[in-house]
């Protein structure tokens, strides 16, 4: 063996050892690295074997499925009737097109790749005989007792004339916890004295391996069937036909599966779900594409670990590791001081991030992160990235503990909790703390308040730091002369620039706005758009609100004692009242005419709107629902009364169909608004 070959073999051995180690940790619920890091290791090993076929051996990690059942497992081993294969992955559009090019088909199925735990079910004459984990694809753990308490898994299949129950049926599926149920599952676990789960997949995997059936019942496990193994007395012509049969027998199938004939439509589906992955009822990490025709599947065959007739397109990771360089704090508009992580830039969920929230000092301690740690971060959609925790195994002793500041980093005021048991520490200098002032300005300029387009984060900070504004009370008195001292709103020649002129124009227009938006803009703690709408709708003026007794305020629908008390407390402060007085003097809306109140046609109804409507903007459709007594919700559940479906509707429409909810088009929605009934 030459020195070069020896080095290649050492490289292969090192990679193979890492892949085996991390795969075992993953399948036995002790992952040390995110899925994306494992995928990268696996792909590196695959590429090495493709470039140097002589390195591949029969037991290479690229040739095997899953991981052997752990020796310490408390469950019995059970052999699958037919091998339970994995899936090969592609990670970009070109790789997908290459696969489609060498795997032509009359029809493909696209299915969401559920981020859960694989399960194998065996039915004999319709009766559930056993359930098992994937294991190494040949042998898994017998988890029949746990599977029997999952409501989605029928104990007895129900045959029909079209689909008689076969003598033997082996089902492949995925067990998961819905995104909606996960917070409650975690809350229950904490109440029981346990540590919270990091994510729904870990929760599902841990739950299936519980020995205590009562604990399994608490976890709200769900299951979706996504394939068949060995069968006797059942020979469907296509995957689609198989799913129809499974559904007829009472087995759950995915509401998101779609049939497509054009490869270009497959690419479009991948793109669609990249943007809508958080619309699904479960977590997903990719889209699975399958050749639908089963005869074609047999002709294409499989490798030792995966079928050639299916592929998984993996989306950019939402959990990755990076280095925690520092922990700093930011000051919010209500004085709350929030620690955040400063990290080495890393690509996560399709964007590069270098900062992530740590919520409060209690969370920093609970998560056990040290400055210098390698940490796992998560970013879901547009959500701010969050540090999940440290990779303790990678510590080298140079890490150091974070010490939470005792003084405000913006103004030097001593920090303190608002009350003894408050986990959040606050800067009490609300009147003149630059950090609070600039964030309050940014907030009141937002779409949910005055909607001042030309006043962004940099502009707000500039107005405060330069002393142009001492607080928000003088905002509507700004003039061109005032802006000449600005660094953001002036040209290099020292004149007011286009942004400055736009700001002054925005300010004039925003004075005449809805009263509820003015209430939101005041940054009264706990008073958000919902409470502000309710208060403005009942009292119609700031003065009437000030004069209203506390008990009366608290009885306002959607307000309650805490919000009412917060409102009263805010107006006890002289400089707060000065803000209102100066805004009023500048012509800002302080009362609104009591016009004809819209008929409460939607009273008590919860309505979800998905997709675009021709006659409404996003804000106006919400206003139309709320002003008629309805609740405009952003998520579909069993409690939803109507789902309004417009152009380019997301998977909320699919979920509504799955739940059997009433679905309306725009015309039906307008009828509902006007008459209280969607019927023609």
Curated annotation (Swiss-Prot):
Keywords, sorted A to Z: DNA damage, DNA repair, DNA replication, Ligase, Magnesium, Manganese, Metal-binding, NAD, Zinc
Q: Give residue ranges for domain BRCT.
A: 597-680
Cofactors required: Mg(2+); Mn(2+)
Binding-site positions, Zn(2+)? 408, 411, 427, 433
Active site as annotated: 113
Q: What is its EC number?
A: 6.5.1.2
Name the positions where NAD(+) binds. 35-39, 86-87, 111, 134, 174, 290, 314
Q: So what does this thing catalyse?
A: NAD(+) + (deoxyribonucleotide)n-3'-hydroxyl + 5'-phospho-(deoxyribonucleotide)m = (deoxyribonucleotide)n+m + AMP + beta-nicotinamide D-nucleotide
Q: Which InterPro entries does the UniProt record give?
A: BRCT_dom, BRCT_dom_sf, DisA/LigA_HHH, DNA_ligase, DNA_ligase_AS, DNA_ligase_CS, DNAligase_adenylation, DNAligase_N
Q: What biological-process GO terms show up in the record? A: DNA repair; DNA replication
- Entries under Pfam families matching the protein: BRCT, DNA_ligase_aden, DNA_ligase_OB, DNA_ligase_ZBD, HHH_2
The GO terms this record gives for MF are: DNA ligase (NAD+) activity; metal ion binding
A single GO CC term, please? Answer: cytosol
Task: State the protein's purpose.
Answer: DNA ligase that catalyzes the formation of phosphodiester linkages between 5'-phosphoryl and 3'-hydroxyl groups in double-stranded DNA using NAD as a coenzyme and as the energy source for the reaction. It is essential for DNA replication and repair of damaged DNA.
Q: Which PANTHER family match?
A: CHROMOSOME TRANSMISSION FIDELITY FACTOR 18, DNA LIGASE
Similarity field: Belongs to the NAD-dependent DNA ligase family. LigA subfamily.
Entry protein name: DNA ligase
